[in-house]
């Protein structure tokens, strides 16, 4: 149950995003709050499994920022990506099944397109995932996503976050090597 977390959410300060009529938490480092420790543990367990089993990588991802989104009736969240992040995520609180889903869109459009006889999540340009209580969705940070207008009476509340690796990225052989610690040492 997310009762304690929901109580804490009601004590937070919010900033209105005028262009979308939605709100985000003023604090963007929410995983440092004691009240979110269970969610933090769940996020890190999920990130570790995702990195190991899906990305098949030994990279260690850490959450760099974490904030709440509140979409009251009539608000939406414009299409966007998350720069300076590898994997992003969204965790859902107290979701009415009637609330708008998250919408993902292909970031790369094809020069040629075959006309499918029937669309599915594998051949569509856009696909929707419903919001479910206590669910965590992880996705590549450069994947375009948005939230349609909330037509329901209840606000749609979600926690979003970005990640980055604390390890060296890429390889010297493929000319994609990125070692922040080495770069910092060379320039200090």
PLM regions and their residue ranges:
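A short glycine-rich, His/Asp/Glu-containing loop-to-beta-strand
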Residues: 61-69
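Non-heme Fe(II)/2-oxoglutarate
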Residues: 1-59, 76, 155-158, 162-188
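Ligand-binding loop in jelly-roll beta-barrel domains
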Residues: 144, 148-158
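A generic structural micro-feature
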Residues: 58-60, 81-85, 151-155
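Catalytic core of non-heme Fe(II) oxygenases with the double-stranded beta-helix
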Residues: 68-138, 148, 165-177
